[in-house]
């Protein structure tokens, strides 16, 4: 997925700036290397970004392409998110060889996911399910499903579509059941803060509406002290009039307690709206839920 994303941005830059020479450099992150443990147990923020950010700070590369959902809410000094792209699909995809939707699964069915967010929301609607950890790239995860290790798996719809696996999607989980991760479906292009040439080069990739939505979503996550591996879901969108709406939840890992609410307002107040919604959910029980998994908010 990471190589596809980098190649996509490289090709877009070459098309927009035909005279530019764009070189791809593959770097492996901690999150890529450790595949035999659940992401939540590896711990720490920046599992999929730290090595790339160090390479930029060292001057080895000029920019890095990330899934926005994998980015910590705090960017290291000297770096900046120079562009956030149009969101492809924010949804979570239900993938199965035999079943069309979560409600069709038999009692006790095995569902694969590496996400505490997905685990919690699945168990909220189907507490009988057996949720199993699933790591590896998209091809590896699909192969494990096809080998019969799981009755179903849940993956980001955008990733499946980008890699040409849209036909494997049996259904998209509705947001009433499954709120996505922060920034899910969008790409973030990170670069050095003072590199005016690179910032100008990637400006055409910026999506104004998605950038505003991401400000609200990331402000929410920042306030709840969350990395990308906590049971928190949030989705924001901006309408044609510049008004933003945001829906968010904090859940217990077993899915039996969910604090959920929404908020609306002017897009110019995106960060304040996201932060205020986080405060509301923390006060409504989210703080106690997060404390149980070692997070003080």
Predicted segments — roles?
Residues 1-42, 49, 124-297:
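Small-molecule-sensing regulatory modules
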Residues 46-59:
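Short, well-structured alpha-helical segments in soluble
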Residues 59, 107, 148:
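Structured loop/turn residues at beta-strand edges in well-structured enzyme cores
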Residues 61-65, 151-152:
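Short, Asp-centered acidic motifs that coordinate Mg2+ and/or phosphate
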Residues 68-71, 75-129:
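A conserved helix-loop-strand patch within extracytoplasmic ligand-binding domains
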């Amino acid at each position: 997925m990471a190589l596809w994303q980098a190649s996509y941005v490289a090709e877009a830059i070459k098309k927009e700036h035909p005279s530019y020479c764009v070189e791809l450099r593959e770097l492996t992150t901690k999150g890529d290397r450790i595949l035999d443990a659940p992401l939540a147990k590896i711990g720490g923020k920046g599992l999929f970004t730290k090595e790339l950010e160090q390479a930029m700070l060292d001057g080895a590369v000029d920019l890095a392409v990330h899934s926005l959902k994998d980015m910590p809410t705090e960017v290291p000094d000297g770096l900046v998110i120079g562009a956030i792209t149009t969101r492809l699909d924010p949804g979570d995809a239900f993938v199965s060889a035999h079943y069309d939707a979560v409600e069709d699964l038999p009692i006790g069915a095995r569902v694969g996911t590496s996400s505490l967010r997905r685990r919690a929301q699945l168990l909220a609607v189907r507490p009988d399910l057996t949720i199993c950890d699933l790591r590896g790239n998209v091809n590896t995860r699909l192969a494990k499903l096809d080998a019969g290790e799981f009755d179903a798996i849940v993956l980001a719809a955008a990733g499946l579509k980008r890699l040409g696996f849209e036909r494997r999607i049996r259904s998209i989980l509705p947001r009433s059941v499954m709120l996505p991760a922060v920034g899910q479906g969008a790409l973030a292009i990170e670069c050095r803060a003072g590199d005016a040439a690179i910032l100008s080069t990637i400006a055409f990739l910026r999506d104004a509406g998605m950038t505003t939505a991401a400000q609200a979503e990331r402000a929410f996550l920042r306030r709840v002290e969350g990395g990308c591996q906590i049971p928190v879901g949030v989705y924001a969108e901006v309408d044609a009039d510049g008004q933003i709406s945001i829906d968010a939840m904090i859940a217990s890992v077993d899915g039996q307690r969910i604090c959920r609410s929404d908020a609306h307002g002017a897009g110019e107040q995106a960060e304040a709206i996201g932060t205020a919604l986080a405060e509301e959910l923390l006060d409504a029980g989210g703080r106690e839920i997060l404390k149980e998994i070692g997070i003080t908010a």
